[in-house]
Amino acid sequence: MANVAVIGAGSWGTAISLVLADNGHDVLLYGREQEHVDEINSSHTNSFYLKDAPLPESIRATTNLKEALDGRSIVFLVVPSSAIRPVSKELNTLLTEPVTIVHAAKGIEPKTHERLSEIIAEEIEPAKRRAIGVLTGPTHAEEVAVRKPTTITIACADLDVADEVQELLTNDQFRVYLNSDVVGAEYGGALKNIIALAAGMTDGLGYGDNAKAALMTRGIVEIARLGVKLGANPASFSGLTGIGDLIVTATSQHSRNWRAGNAIGRGEKLEDVLGNMGMVVEGVRACEAAHSLAKEAGVEMPITEALYNVLFEGKSPHDEVKKLMRRPQKHEMEQVFHFEE
């Protein structure tokens, strides 16, 4: 049995806590909202985020971050990407022994263009962390919480640590694969949200299955092109951390990114959509960061650019689709496998 802290009592943090508790581990879940923490401890539910999922009674929750970390050897950091830096700073002030840190967020910091593990490494002193890993893949918390079969990847440069995390989480409903390509895992998880937003938008526009299939296929090509340019293994984009994550995020109404894109496609304004969602839509931040990164790296990302124009430049979705359809003609396999071109 391991002593585990889960930082973040949202839908995904709660679902990860459930998997760990099912496997017999001692789980202490940290949340900022006293109301949610009290409900977890008294009713063993977290109805704001996972309304149909009773939780194991062994899961305990607290609003005291120091208490959550005390005596814990593994820390799962399950907060929005925008909170990774401030929360990591807090952890650095409170950690007294080195711990394994596994983050389960998907994003890129817009101002610095840093991946989330890079931010964690900056903010938490080396003496206070044993290793940094990322848990990512095609997972909806709503399905994990009711124990539907799910597969996911733990990516870590230290495969011995990854193996430990794999053992912690794996059970009959939750299968974990190993990957040493942290760069590819993080870029796959972050950049696919851009394509998922665009997929929701095509559905909202009523363009049908043909357009959505084309968007997803060409979308994985362009996010892989950027990821490989920035140091990722191209194989990661054909696995759970790439195409797998894209499929689940771009095709399901569980997906916040799909729902946000769908609403925009139906004519709603971005600010209204974000206000009504009540939860983070990571694809918006990812689009802003990727648009800038692509310019710096000299990588062509036409779908990302089109989405950026809609979200941040006020352009018409219909007009941007027309521009995509009338781009110069080319061979389909151009730059699909030869990413360096």
Curated annotation (Swiss-Prot):
* Chain positions recorded as NADPH binding sites: 11-12, 32, 106, 141, 256, 280, 282
Give the catalysed reaction(s), semicolon-separated: sn-glycerol 3-phosphate + NAD(+) = dihydroxyacetone phosphate + NADH + H(+); sn-glycerol 3-phosphate + NADP(+) = dihydroxyacetone phosphate + NADPH + H(+)
Q: Name one GO biological process term.
A: phospholipid biosynthetic process
* Pathways involved: Membrane lipid metabolism; glycerophospholipid metabolism
Name the EC number(s): 1.1.1.94
- Family membership noted in the UniProt record: Belongs to the NAD-dependent glycerol-3-phosphate dehydrogenase family.
What is the purpose of this protein? Catalyzes the reduction of the glycolytic intermediate dihydroxyacetone phosphate (DHAP) to sn-glycerol 3-phosphate (G3P), the key precursor for phospholipid synthesis.
Output this protein's name: Glycerol-3-phosphate dehydrogenase [NAD(P)+]
Q: Which gene encodes it?
A: gpsA
